[in-house]
Regions:
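Short Gly/Ser/Thr- and Asp/Glu-enriched loop/turn motifs at secondary-structure junctions
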Residues: 40-44
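Short Pro-Cys-Gly-centered "Cys-loop" motif that presents a nucleophilic cysteine in a tight turn
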Residues: 1-38, 50-148
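A generic structural motif
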Residues: 45-49
Length: 148
C-alpha cells in the first residue's frame, strides 16, 4: 500500500492506471511477484502481494520508482509521488487474506465521496475479475483467494 504526497492525484487518467498495471505486470514476471488483489484510487494503491523470492523491498522500489519516473516524464514534473517507500503488513494466506481483499475491494464505495455505488462498477480493482464480470489481467494471481 502506498499513498501520494499531500493527496496528489497520481492516477489522473485511464492511461495512468494502465501504465501502473504495465509496471505490475513487468514486476510479476521479472521478480516472481504474485498479486492476489488490487485496488487503485486516484491518490493511492492497495496490493496484497506474495514475494516467493523474499524480495519485497526490491519489487516495491521497482514499482514506485518506475511509475514515478514515467509519471514525471509524461507530466513534465519532478520529485516524489508517494509518501515514503510503502506500507507492508504480513498476512497469512487464509481468512485474514480474504478479509483484507474484501477491505481493499470496498475502498471505492467506503470513502466519504464514493466513486461508484457497487464494487463491480469500479474498473481499477480486481473485484470484477473475481466475480467473472471482467477478464483477469495476465499477471493477476487470484487462485489463493479463490481457494481460501
Amino acid at each position: 500500500m502506498n499513498r501520494s504526497v499531500a493527496g496528489r492525484s497520481v492516477f489522473a487518467s485511464p492511461a495512468c492506471y494502465q501504465a501502473f498495471f504495465d509496471i505490475l505486470s513487468e514486476a510479476c514476471f521479472r521478480y516472481g511477484l504474485m498479486v492476489h488483489a488490487y485496488c487503485l484510487a486516484h491518490n493511492q494503491y492497495h496490493l496484497p502481494l506474495k514475494t516467493p523470492k523474499g524480495n519485497l523491498s526490491r519489487v516495491m522500489r521497482h514499482i514506485n520508482g518506475v511509475y514515478t519516473q514515467r509519471y514525471n516524464h509524461v507530466n513534465d514534473t519532478h520529485g516524489p509521488l508517494f509518501k515514503g517507500r510503502f506500507k507492508a503488513v504480513l498476512v497469512e494466506p487464509d481468512d485474514a487474506l480474504l478479509k483484507l481483499s474484501q477491505l481493499i475491494h470496498n475502498r471505492p464505495i467506503a470513502i466519504k465521496k464514493p466513486v461508484v455505488k457497487h464494487w463491480v462498477d469500479y474498473p481499477w480493482s480486481s473485484y470484477p475479475a473475481y466475480i467473472s464480470k471482467a477478464a483477469p489481467l495476465s499477471w493477476f494471481s487470484q487462485d489463493t483467494l479463490c481457494n481460501a
